[in-house]
């Protein structure tokens, strides 16, 4: 129930428009940046190599199996790196700022995640991290005390809400852009006086609410794993399609064929990685993603058929 309330509250705040969402997100993000940076810097004082090595592959899995089990969570950490591109219509000078934000943001997240999580693994025993619903807060308990840990957890909850706010904003913008290009019904493109696609947001909220109810579990960790795998697969499918489209886009931009061929190796490696990630997420996630993709394809085909009939009727009326 709490998750559903937060979903709706974050969506309603987005009705205030781009600037309000941006300002609020810029404030809330510090609730996670500061604790993570503290762990990655002063956390080394509490770092115990013996605890770290005990947490290294505790189940003695072969390398292949260890990679398979961790790949979905790794990708989850980077989901959303395309947000700058998705929100390009709300960015000043997008041709310059979107590529900078995408590359810089991805590199920054990589450094922060790798540094902070490795330090945590050397502070808190692996079994305690595994059974905790708030691993960052637990780390601050080991570093300081319960009071400071509670303050940190409160700040990170606020930061997570800010991230949810951004996700709701980005999702509504993606559907708005798709609707403007004819891929989704026009209802997703209708905006209020603050340029917020209110009706589309309510439709998305209904879907999110149902998804939250269907994946409900007594264990927060189990529900998190289900949603992570489903989110990774449904996001990786568009990544594959985008990778396959890049050579065509490069040719349209007049890029030399020799340069495109050199990049084909990178594109191929990206496709293989994405397909392996889909496989690693498991059968249930693939089935759920297949259902979601199928629904999207049905909507797309129906929209195209409707647009074709409309254009044909218009042409007949002109003739």
How would you label these PLM feature ranges?
Residues 222, 234-238, 248, 261-319:
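A generic transmembrane alpha-helix motif of multi-pass inner-membrane proteins
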Residues 10-14, 36-43, 113, 117-121, ...:
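Structural signal for membrane-spanning alpha-helices in multi-pass inner-membrane proteins
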Residues 27-153, 285-288:
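Helix-loop-helix junctions that connect adjacent transmembrane segments
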Residues 1, 35, 90-95, 100-108, ...:
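Helix-loop-helix connectors at the membrane interface of multi-pass transporters/channels
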Residues 19-29, 151-154, 213-240, 254-261, ...:
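Transmembrane helix-loop boundary segments of multi-pass membrane transporters
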């Amino acid at each position: 129930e709490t998750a559903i309330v937060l979903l709706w509250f974050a969506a309603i705040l987005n009705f205030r428009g781009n600037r309000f969402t941006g300002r609020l997100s810029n404030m809330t993000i510090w609730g996670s940046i500061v604790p993570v940076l503290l762990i990655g810097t002063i956390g080394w004082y509490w770092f115990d190599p013996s605890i770290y090595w005990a947490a290294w592959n505790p189940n003695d899995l072969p390398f292949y199996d260890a990679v398979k089990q961790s790949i979905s969570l790794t990708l989850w950490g980077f989901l959303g790196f395309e947000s700058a591109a998705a929100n390009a219509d709300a960015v000043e000078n997008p041709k310059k700022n979107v590529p900078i934000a995408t590359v810089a943001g991805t590199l920054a997240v990589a450094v922060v995640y790798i540094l902070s999580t490795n330090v945590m693994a050397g502070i808190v025993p692996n079994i305690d991290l595994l059974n905790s619903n708030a691993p960052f807060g637990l780390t601050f308990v080991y570093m300081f005390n319960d009071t400071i840990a509670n303050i940190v957890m409160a700040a990170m909850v606020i930061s997570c809400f800010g991230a949810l706010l951004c996700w709701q904003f980005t999702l509504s913008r993606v559907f708005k852009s798709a609707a403007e290009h004819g891929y989704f019904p026009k209802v997703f493109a209708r905006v209020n006086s603050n340029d917020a696609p209110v009706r589309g947001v309510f439709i998305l909220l209904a879907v999110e609410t149902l998804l939250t109810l269907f994946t409900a579990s007594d264990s927060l960790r189990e529900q998190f794993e289900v949603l992570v795998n489903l989110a990774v697969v449904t996001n990786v499918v568009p990544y594959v399609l985008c990778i396959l489209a890049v050579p065509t886009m490069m040719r349209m931009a007049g890029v030399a064929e020799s340069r495109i061929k050199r990049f084909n190796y990178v594109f191929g490696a990206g496709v293989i990685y994405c397909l392996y990630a889909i496989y690693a997420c498991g059968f249930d996630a693939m089935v759920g993603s297949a259902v979601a993709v199928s629904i999207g394809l049905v909507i797309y085909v129906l929209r195209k058929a409707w647009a074709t009939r409309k254009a044909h009727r218009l042409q007949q009326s002109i003739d």
